[in-house]
Swiss-Prot record:
It comes from Aquarana catesbeiana (American bullfrog). This is one of the three pore-forming subunits of the heterotrimeric epithelial sodium channel (ENaC), a critical regulator of sodium balance and fluid homeostasis. ENaC operates in epithelial tissues, where it mediates the electrodiffusion of sodium ions from extracellular fluid through the apical membrane of cells, with water following osmotically. It plays a key role in maintaining sodium homeostasis through electrogenic sodium reabsorption in the kidneys. Additionally, ENaC is essential for airway surface liquid homeostasis, which is crucial for proper mucus clearance. It comes from the Eukaryota. PROSITE patterns: ASC. GO terms for biological process: multicellular organismal-level water homeostasis; sodium ion homeostasis; sodium ion transmembrane transport. Originally identified and characterized by its inhibition by the diuretic drug amiloride. One of its GO terms (cellular component) is plasma membrane. It is a multi-pass membrane protein. NCBIfam families: ENaC (TIGR00859). This is Epithelial sodium channel subunit beta. Its main location: membrane. The gene is SCNN1B. The chain crosses the membrane at residues 246-273. Residues 1-245 are extracellular.
Length: 273
């Protein structure tokens, strides 16, 4: 299961933190319910977490971090904002509209990112050469997901595309970084939770809250506590600026021209005298 907190979509009100610090952040108790795990499909028992901007698609598998059961995990967050210069100083994109790849994640009302562009590009190549779409990525318009009945050769075709360096380079060259981007730096600390002195009553309360009609027992192998908060409200802003623009270039050329032209005129006058 995947849950998004403070997504801000579909008219949902965004929640704001009043102050920095652990007392003013998000606090959760999670139960990963290992009894529901399917053998051979999942060998890791944990919750995977990612912090991202509103309207950015969360690529949890690639960018997430793990939180262990039986622990209290505190995540202190700092934000870095990066602003790149647009053309002609760089090849960054403002909103992805100038990228020759159709964003298959736009149907989720999500903004442009390099990850979404790379996956969209791969899906286009998959549909072009294998005649079907990869089942873990959203569908392109007019395409269908690969299946063994209609596309018996899709598996070797998929691995051939995945292992071909030229296809990856093609997508990397087309997918440019956004001109404005935000990253979240996380400081993570963990401690055993609950403590030996408190585990009896905590497990009893959590078992009761989970289901009052069934005899369900919560234990250390399935629960964890999460604290996510801003370390401080200040953020670091990294912005690019041109060392020389057209105005400065013309000004410098004019100054140099005037200096050397004036010196030349003086030399000619002195030589004439």
């Amino acid at each position: 299961n995947c849950y998004i907190f403070n997504w801000g979509q579909e008219g949902q009100e965004l929640l704001e933190s009043a102050n920095p610090g652990a007392d003013f952040g998000l606090k959760m108790v999670l139960d990963i319910d290992q009894k529901e795990y399917i053998p051979f499909l999942q060998s890791t028992a944990a919750a995977r977490i990612i912090l991202h901007q509103q309207r950015s698609f969360p690529f949890l598998k690639d960018l997430g971090i793990y939180a262990m059961p039986g622990t209290e995990t505190s995540i202190a967050v700092l934000e870095d904002q990066t602003q790149h210069l647009e053309a002609p100083y760089s090849s960054c994109t403002v909103d992805g509209s100038d990228i020759p790849v159709a964003n298959i994640y736009s149907k989720f009302n999500s903004s442009y990112s390099i990850q979404s562009c790379l996956r969209s590009c791969f899906q286009e190549i998959m549909v072009k050469y294998c005649k079907c779409a990869y089942y873990l990525f959203p569908l392109l318009n007019g395409a269908h997901y690969c299946n063994n009945q209609e596309d018996p050769d899709w598996v070797p075709c998929y691995y051939n595309i995945w292992d071909t360096v030229s296809h990856r380079e093609q997508c990397i060259n087309m997918c440019q970084q956004p001109c404005n981007d935000s990253n979240y730096k996380m400081t993570i600390s963990m401690a055993d939770w609950p403590s030996a002195a408190a585990e009896d009553w905590i497990f009893h309360v959590l078992s009761y809250e989970k289901d009052t009609s069934l005899d369900i027992t919560v234990n250390r192998d399935g629960i964890m506590r999460l604290n996510i908060y801003f370390e401080e409200f200040n953020y670091r802003s990294i912005s690019e600026s041109p060392t020389t623009n057209v105005v400065w270039l013309l000004s410098n050329l004019g100054g140099q021209f005037g200096f050397w032209m004036g010196g030349s005129v003086l030399c000619i006058i002195e030589f004439g005298e």
